[in-house]
Swiss-Prot record:
TM regions (residue ranges): 3-23, 76-96, 118-138, 161-181, 188-208, 244-264, 272-292, 307-327
Keyword DNA repair included in the entry's annotation: no
UniProt subcellular location: Cell inner membrane
E.C. number: 7.1.1.-
Species of provenance: Nitratiruptor sp. (strain SB155-2)
Record field: catalytic activity: a quinone + NADH + 5 H(+)(in) = a quinol + NAD(+) + 4 H(+)(out)
HAMAP family in alphabetical order: NDH1_NuoH (MF_01350)
Family from the record: Belongs to the complex I subunit 1 family.
Single GO MF annotation: NADH dehydrogenase activity
Protein name per Swiss-Prot or TrEMBL: NADH-quinone oxidoreductase subunit H
Record text on subunit structure and interactions: NDH-1 is composed of 14 different subunits. Subunits NuoA, H, J, K, L, M, N constitute the membrane sector of the complex.
Bilayer topology annotation: Multi-pass membrane protein
The encoding gene: nuoH
């Protein structure tokens, strides 16, 4: 392992940490503006031009708020839970190829921290491990609303992880690999080669499961204000609460990259649009879709969430895998 590789990897890690932490903060501004537009309001307007400095003001507020730990909390677990959420969100990005290769000063740069041949499995596995953050936070807070939020975390994440895995199984059978780079290369050659045309059902199933994995409306039962206050995060404040928040937004971008790489051609050129710009358009479209859904859809009840998972999405995912296997064997 040469020094150039180590230095390049460290730089990539720092870029991912800095960029997506900043995007998580800026994402709040975009979300508030999008929701305001859809509700015929203005949103943030007073801090800086068009409210652009609201993100900075919110960041200062989080950094300076008191780090309060409840008297009945299990202190070590309570303190480590937000770190688990943020860490798993960023670790999952290590195996995601975000842009095409490019050259700087004769050195070829691969915009991926770790190009492993089990990239898809790694990303899904690390994202699944992220459930321990909200789960431990709720169980260690000594608060009944937080405990209810933790219970919802367990049933929601564990159930929809199965749907996520089954939905990508059919595309994996077609590509013959679980490397995200191989998924991208398989779809080279234009829109006609995108996997969404061969696996439209898998695309829909994976996207719906992505909403549940990221705790976004209509599946935001973990911290539904009208039912469980702030759920698992009820007793958190300051930067510990901010870590949960950063993890959620980072996971939204991760899902956007996964959907783009698996089903929508990844970072291959999109007509006259270069690949790097093309994948950014796709990722930010899905980020906007998360916000659009929040403004348009009501919350679902926990029983409706489980009914949708086990009686609708799960059978459809299994049927899709069976049909794909039959078609490939003919």
């Amino acid at each position: 392992m040469d020094a150039a590789f180590v230095i390049a990897t460290i730089i990539k890690i720092l870029i991912v940490l800095g960029l997506f932490s900043a995007l998580a903060g800026f994402g709040t501004y975009v979300e508030r503006k999008v929701l305001a537009f859809m509700q015929r309001r203005l949103g943030p307007m007073h801090v800086g031009p068009y409210g652009l400095l609201q993100v900075l003001a919110d960041g200062i507020k989080l950094f300076t708020k008191e780090d309060f730990i409840p008297q009945g909390a299990v202190r070590p677990v309570f303190m480590i839970a937000p770190v688990i959420t943020a860490a798993t969100a960023f670790i999952a990005m290590a195996a995601i190829p975000m842009f095409p290769e490019f050259t700087i000063g004769g050195y070829t740069v691969k915009p991926i921290i770790s190009d492993i041949n089990v990239g898809l499995l790694f990303v899904l596995g690390v994202m699944a491990a992220g459930l321990y953050g909200p789960l431990l936070a709720g169980m260690s807070s000594g608060n009944k609303w937080a405990l209810l939020g933790a219970a919802r975390t367990a049933i929601q994440f564990l159930s929809y992880e199965v749907v996520t895995g089954l939905s990508v199984l059919a595309p994996v059978m077609i590509v013959g690999s679980i490397s995200l780079v191989d998924f991208n290369n398989y779809q080279a050659g234009g829109m006609g080669n995108w996997l969404i045309w061969k696996q439209p059902l898998a695309f829909v199933l994976f996207l719906i499961a992505g909403y549940a994995e990221t705790n976004r409306t209509p599946f935001d039962l973990l911290e539904h204000e009208a039912e469980v206050i702030s759920g698992y995060a009820t007793e958190y404040s300051g930067m510990r609460w901010g870590m949960f928040f950063i993890g959620e937004y980072a996971n939204m971008f991760t899902i956007g990259f996964l959907v783009s790489l698996i089903f929508l051609g990844g970072f291959n050129d999109w007509g006259f649009i270069p690949g790097a710009i093309a994948i950014l358009i796709k990722v930010f479209f899905f980020f906007f879709l998360f916000l659009w859904t929040r403004a348009s859809w009501p919350h679902v009840r926990p029983d409706q969430l489980m009914w949708l998972c086990w009686k609708v999405l799960m059978p459809l995912a299994v049927i899709n895998v069976v049909i794909t296997g039959i078609v490939m064997s003919i």
